[in-house]
């Protein structure tokens, strides 16, 4: 009779109440239970108050209650009915597996990446080609402009040269006219003297031979003097240029004088002399070979870039800026 009453009384008590009563009978505090079970004091308090924390899974809560029961010597079988009410097992929600292929997604992503890569490559190639074409076009326009300027300057020089030649010829004709009219009087006087004076034939022959010999000596002496004047000493600061193809160029010395400006043909050569340093503009650097003071001038950096060469040749040998 008493056993049945005790059993009914135990069933009336909840799990938390039974664990608290057993703890108090053993003289343990909530802090001591929490330290032995390695739990928080708040967790022990929730178990004794029959609370199920929302952030705690039911599986862990049931394990904590069983450990608490073993600690205070309460049979686990007596707590099972209360555990079902306090910490019921919750069915885990399993999300349905998506029906897709990982390989297909990866292939699709790789396809987009490859398309973007090709697009970037095409843009880079297009911009590079446009830049090269603009640069090439600008160089051609610059060469054409310089060639037109040099042609206009050459035409102006030719016109001025023709005017100087015409003036020189006019002056020469004016100077020659008195010289041609002057010998008229001696002819008349010579004729008169001839009428009054008879010259011996032998004397006339001697005078004629002497005159012709003197003229021969004079004419033979003239080329020697002219050759001596026409052979000046070579200038050490001269620029020597040989052309392997058609090339436009302009050469200016330190005084600003244009030594040459125009087009040179294939297999042509130039020998220019002026005051150093020289400033050069060369339309096709690969078509010309330059020597200064007997040493070649390096144009390789202009040939590699295929640009119009603008350089200054200093007084030092083969130094170009």
Swiss-Prot record:
PROSITE patterns in the cross-refs: HTH_CROC1
A GO BP entry: regulation of cell shape
Domain HTH cro/C1-type: 19-71
CDD domains: HTH_XRE (cd00093)
InterPro entries xref list: Bact_Cytoskel_RodZ, Cro/C1-type_HTH, Lambda_DNA-bd_dom_sf, RodZ, RodZ-like_C
Positions of disulphide bridges: none
DNA-binding region, residue intervals: 30-49
Major site of localization recorded for this protein: membrane
Localisation per UniProt entry: Cell inner membrane
Periplasmic-side positions: 133-321
Location of region: Disordered: 167-190
Protein purpose: Cytoskeletal protein that is involved in cell-shape control through regulation of the length of the long axis.
Record's comment describing the protein's domains: The helix-turn-helix (HTH) motif in the cytoplasmic domain of the N-terminus is involved in the formation of spirals to maintain the rigid rod shape. As this protein is anchored in the cytoplasmic membrane, the HTH motif may contribute to protein-protein interactions to form the RodZ helix, which is localized beneath the cytoplasmic membrane. The C-terminal domain may be critical for determination of the rod shape by probably interacting with enzymes required for synthesis of the peptidoglycan layer, including PBPs in the periplasm.
Protein name per the record: Cytoskeleton protein RodZ
Source species taxonomy: Bacteria, Pseudomonadati, Pseudomonadota, Gammaproteobacteria, Enterobacterales
Gene: rodZ
């Amino acid at each position: 009779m008493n056993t049945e009453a005790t059993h009914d009384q135990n069933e009336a008590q909840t799990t938390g109440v039974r664990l608290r009563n057993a703890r108090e009978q053993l003289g343990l505090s909530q802090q001591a239970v929490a330290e032995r079970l390695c739990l928080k004091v708040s967790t022990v308090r929730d178990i004794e108050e029959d609370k199920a924390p929302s952030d705690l899974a039911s599986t862990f809560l049931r394990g904590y209650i069983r450990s608490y029961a073993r600690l205070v010597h309460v049979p686990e079988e007596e707590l099972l009915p209360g555990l079902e009410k306090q910490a019921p097992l919750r069915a885990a929600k399993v999300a349905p597996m998506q029906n897709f292929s990982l390989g297909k997604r990866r292939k699709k992503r790789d396809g987009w990446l490859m398309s973007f890569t090709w697009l970037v490559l095409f843009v880079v190639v297009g911009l590079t080609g446009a830049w090269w074409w603009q640069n090439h076009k600008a160089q051609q326009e610059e060469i054409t402009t310089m060639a037109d300027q040099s042609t206009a300057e050459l035409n102006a020089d030719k016109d001025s040269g023709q005017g100087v030649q015409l003036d020189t010829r006019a002056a020469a004709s004016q100077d020659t006219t008195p010289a041609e009219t002057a010998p008229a009087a001696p002819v008349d006087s010579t004729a008169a003297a001839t009428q009054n004076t008879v010259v011996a034939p032998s004397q006339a022959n001697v005078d004629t031979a002497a005159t012709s010999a003197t003229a021969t000596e004079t004419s033979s002496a003239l080329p020697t003097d002219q050759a001596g004047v026409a052979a000046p000493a070579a200038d050490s600061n001269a620029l020597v240029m040989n052309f392997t193809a058609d090339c436009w160029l302009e050469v200016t010395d330190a005084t600003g004088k244009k030594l040459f400006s125009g087009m040179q043909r294939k297999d042509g050569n130039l020998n220019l002399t002026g005051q150093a340093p020289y400033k050069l503009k060369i339309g096709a650097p690969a078509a010309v070979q330059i020597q200064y003071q007997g040493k070649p001038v390096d144009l390789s950096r202009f040939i590699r870039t295929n640009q119009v060469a603008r350089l200054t040749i200093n007084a030092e040998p083969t130094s170009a800026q």
